[in-house]
Every structure is written in structure tokens, then in C-alpha cells.
Amino acid sequence: MNEFAQEIVDFDNKAKKIFFSLYEKFAESAKQLDRKKDDNVFQQQQGKYLNTLKTQLENLAQDLLNKYSSLKNINLLNKKLRDEINIYLNEFRQKSRAL
């Protein structure tokens, strides 16, 4: 079995809710922009939401690291959670470009 599978599932279940909530808010705010005229505003909005997503996911990861602090290889779990955060951030960027 995959090491830390349950911990990653725990993270993903909560992270998905954060991701989709923020993405929906971003998509709604982006709808009001004309991308040709307001691309700089779009980029600023995207950056704001990306930073918020990153912060919230990092806080979630830290909470889980604290919860599972007695595990061996906690540094490996930390790396896996950071990898997961980067996946969510890249997904947000890709979905944003499609708007």
C-alpha cells in the first residue's frame, strides 16, 4: 500500500472543497472582465486567488502535519503534501486560462 495514502486522501478531501470554492469565486469575478481590455486586472485577480489558495492549502497541510506528527517519516509526508499543493495550484492556473 502507498505510504501516507490515508493522510493524502484526508488532505485531498478538504483541499478539493477549498479549491472549488475559490475557483468558483474567481470565475464569477472574471466573468465581469473583458479579457482583451482588462487582462492586467484578470492577472491581478488570478494572483490574488492563487495566493489565497496557496495559503489555505499550506494551512491545511500544516494542520495535518500537526495531527500526524507522531508518524515516522513526517518529512516525507510534508514533501508529499507540498507536491499536492503544487498540483492544485497548477490546476487552478490551467482552469483560469480557459476562462
Q: Model-flagged regions — what are they?
A:
Residues 19, 23-26, 30, 34, ...:
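Long, hydrophobic, amphipathic alpha-helical segments used as structural scaffolds
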